[in-house]
Amino acid sequence: MQMMQRNVVGQRPVAGSRRSLVVANVAEVTRPAVSTNGKHRTGVPEGTPIVTPQDLPSRPRRNRRSESFRASVREVNVSPANFILPIFIHEESNQNVPIASMPGINRLAYGKNVIDYVAEPRSYGVNQVVVFPKTPDHLKTQTAEEAFNKNGLSQRTIRLLKDSFPDLEVYTDVALDPYNSDGHDGIVSDAGVILNDETIEYLCRQAVSQAEAGADVVSPSDMMDGRVGAIRRALDREGFTNVSIMSYTAKYASAYYGPFRDALASAPKPGQAHRRIPPNKKTYQMDPANYREAIREAKADEAEGADIMMVKPGMPYLDVVRLLRETSPLPVAVYHVSGEYAMLKAAAERGWLNEKDAVLEAMTCFRRAGGDLILTYYGIEASKWLAGEK
């Protein structure tokens, strides 16, 4: 039997032995940062090992070596042209009203305040807004007829914006919850059922009234079955063939909507003794656990005439954004919702993250996942950051 060679401290292992190879390899990566003349290498910390360069044909870091080169090979870019700015409107006073759960966001007083607010982001390239009116309680009813009042707050705001900025793209919200005393997107029966087809009749009237006011894009967010096709037919019947539909295709029953409902006082209102008002919107909005269901919704919306499909919320549902991007040729919108905005604001206010970097990273992720349009309350700030402002 061959005797094992004893490793003596300071003695070089026998050439060709397994141990000689191991020791040699270890030596390659553990020698201190000293050159052959005994002097330390310059430009690296003392103690940095001297190694034999790896024989790598591909080194991905070469394409990350400088900001200029990184920019030249960047796969997606974010532009203010991608942003749609949500605006909340009220007329309870002539003053803007801060929304406590959305720092930096106000309910804008109808009139000059709205014009002034929209003018600023336009100067940075944000030329799309979506209008959300806060309806006074005395105008809310169980059947939400205020939704299609031709002189309602939403309709007047659309006219105001189009008169002031003819080239502004004005999107609207098509749903009954801002006008419904029960706080739901559809009409609620006494038994607590959201009436699908009856609701659609009023959604069609709402969409037509918005188109008559000058809306460029109507956006059904209600999640009633068949509403896109019905709205398309209603618009075409009234001569609005050029008005687009951005469907909330995959709108999830999410916990991230809380601040938005604060802004419009539009949360469900259960607890009535004689009526079973659902405490949430889970019978019509999608289950957060579901992925394949989004394909079914997308196929239906595309077949019914949607021009744009939306995923809401955004960051927790990037897989669904990618799914729609890969299964449909239609533009995909992503809603960076109020809860996502509030979380970023809260963390930034406490110094837990760099707000600018985090927001622009989020916008980039929406684009990388396949989003063409981004509805975001950061529209003004992000456009300024993209322009180089601090």
Swiss-Prot record:
Q: How is the cofactor bound?
A: Binds 2 magnesium ions per monomer. The first magnesium ion is required for catalysis. The second functions as allosteric activator.
What CDD domains is this protein classified in? ALAD_PBGS_aspartate_rich
A single Pfam family it belongs to is ALAD
GO cellular-component term (any)? chloroplast
Q: Which reaction does it catalyse?
A: 2 5-aminolevulinate = porphobilinogen + 2 H2O + H(+)
Look up keyword Hydrolase and say if it applies: no
Enumerate the residues binding 5-aminolevulinate 2: 338, 377
What GO biological process terms are annotated to this protein in UniProt?
Answer: chlorophyll biosynthetic process; protoporphyrinogen IX biosynthetic process
Enzyme Commission number, as recorded? 4.2.1.24
| Gene3D superfamilies with a match to the protein in the record | Aldolase class I (3.20.20.70)
Q: Which residues cross the membrane?
A: none
Q: Which cellular compartments is it found in?
A: Plastid, Chloroplast
The record's keywords, sorted A to Z, are: Allosteric enzyme, Chlorophyll biosynthesis, Chloroplast, Heme biosynthesis, Lyase, Magnesium, Metal-binding, Plastid, Porphyrin biosynthesis, Transit peptide
Q: Where is this region: Disordered?
A: 34-69
Q: Cofactor(s) for this protein? A: Mg(2+)
Pathway-wise, it operates in: Porphyrin-containing compound metabolism; protoporphyrin-IX biosynthesis; coproporphyrinogen-III from 5-aminolevulinate: step 1/4
Which residue positions are annotated as catalytic? 251 (schiff-base intermediate with substrate), 312 (schiff-base intermediate with substrate)
Q: Where is the transit peptide?
A: 1-24
| Domain of life the protein comes from | Eukaryota
What sort of enzyme, by top EC class, is this?
lyase
Query: Family per UniProt?
Result: Belongs to the ALAD family.
Provide the function of this protein: Catalyzes an early step in the biosynthesis of tetrapyrroles. Binds two molecules of 5-aminolevulinate per subunit, each at a distinct site, and catalyzes their condensation to form porphobilinogen.
How the protein assembles, per its UniProt entry?
Homooctamer.
Write the protein's name: Delta-aminolevulinic acid dehydratase, chloroplastic
Instruction: Give the classification, highest ranks.
Output: Eukaryota, Viridiplantae, Chlorophyta, core chlorophytes, Chlorophyceae
